[in-house]
Amino acid sequence: MSGYIYCITNSKYKIDDIYKLGYTAAKMTIDEVHDLQTDYLNHQKALGYDSADGHDRSAAMGAYQMMEVKAVAQSMGFDTSKTLFNKETQDKMADYYLNIAGYQQWKAGKISDQQFNDALAIQFASIKKASGKGAHDGDGMNNAYGNIMPLLKQLRE
């Protein structure tokens, strides 16, 4: 994760004009973030980052480095033209990702720490799977560094 900075974009590629204009994702609507992400990906493609599967491009934004911001917001029932991509919204969206990974099942004891951990690693590229590797390692963009297994075991106790 990005250290909980709610207004950042992925730092591998920089679009100087965006930073010069003073954009801050936390003050933008979901639609504006989606448009910026799309423009950002297209800009990277124009620079020659053009793999067939797009693994060499990213427009991850916010504290949790989210990609499918608009799709997630819509599935959560947000009005994407009015909802800001601020701390409150990002935290709610992170909860959504936790639940996609099985948080409620883990909390109820229906899945193991390892199963939950590995599902989280799919949602959050910074988290290592129980095997020690990230679900997205080797994609040219990500490298997992966080081992949360000890934390999950501690929370379970």
Where are these regions (language model features)?
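Cell-wall polysaccharide-cleaving catalytic domain and substrate-binding groove, primarily
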Residues: 1-84, 89-157
